[in-house]
A protein has these predicted regions:
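Conserved catalytic core of sirtuin-type NAD+-dependent deacylases
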Residues: 1-244
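Short, basic-rich loop-to-helix N-cap that marks the start of a DNA-contacting helix
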Residues: 247
Length: 247
């Protein structure tokens, strides 16, 4: 077994204050693509790049076009949690993982059983009326066409942080607090290039910074442990070993 994975297993065994920070790579193993890596594919079908469509100004100006893309590319109702999601939920159940901080909006961590999940970019599971603030579930968006409207006539907006919008300060402060006090910080499935989210890891004060990503990241040089493998296989395998040892 890879010696870095052996070391990570040891750190997980010994710690009861693990914080996980994840990006799109955590969900690709559930069949949800990282739209940044396939811009060309989307550009064939849409007149604008994803970053433009998923912006606040585009939503306000071209709401129908926004929803055409959103239903087509951002909602994956058949996606199921993978080994990474289940491993983290299990570690939380054992009192080891204190929080999952995610850049993803798919709700798969909660579906796997994690309770303390901080969603930096919001979630597709919730939507709200911009006029009366009534909430609607994901199904409502999927089962309507065009621009979804509330009973009051207001336009419904996904509870997702779009480009040009600020992250929720309360969520950020909570994430900073967890990271600052973490013993082990595991960062996985993210290129660490999207700010301000990527800047959160600068608050870590410990000496067990773990990076799990298939490709190199700008922070590889400051990490205490770097594993260039899929996150599901890595965490899933470790969790299997850990739980069988603990049984």
């Amino acid at each position: 077994m890879n010696e870095n994975i052996v070391k990570l297993e040891k750190w997980i065994k010994e710690s009861d204050n693990i914080v996980f920070f994840g990006g799109a790579g955590v969900s690709t193993e559930s069949g949800i693509p990282d739209f940044r890596s396939v811009d060309g594919l989307y550009n064939r079908k849409y007149d604008y790049p994803p970053e433009t469509i998923l912006s606040h100004s585009f939503f306000m100006r071209n709401t129908e076009e926004f929803y055409r893309f959103y239903r087509d590319k951002m909602l994956y109702k058949d996606a199921k949690p993978n080994k990474a999601h289940y491993a983290l939920a299990e570690l939380e159940k054992q009192g080891k993982c204190k929080a999952v901080i995610t850049q993803n909006i798919d709700g798969l961590h909660q579906a796997a059983g994690s309770k303390e999940v901080l969603e930096l970019h919001g979630t597709v599971k919730k939507n709200y009326c911009m006029k009366c603030h009534k909430f609607y579930g994901e199904e409502y968006i999927m089962n309507t066409s065009g621009v979804p409207k509330c009973d009051c006539g207001g336009i419904i907006k996904p509870y997702v942080v779009l480009y040009e919008e600020s992250l929720d300060n309360d969520v950020i402060e909570k994430a900073v607090d967890y990271i600052r006090h973490a013993d082990v910080l595991i960062i996985a499935g993210t290129s660490l290039t999207v700010y301000p989210a990527a800047g959160l890891i600068d608050y870590y004060r410990g000496n067990k910074l773990v990076l799990i990503n298939k490709s190199v990241t700008p922070k590889d040089n400051i990490a205490d442990l770097v594993i260039h493998e899929p996150v599901g296989e890595t965490l899933g395998g470790i969790c299997l070993l850990y739980t069988s040892d603990a049984a």
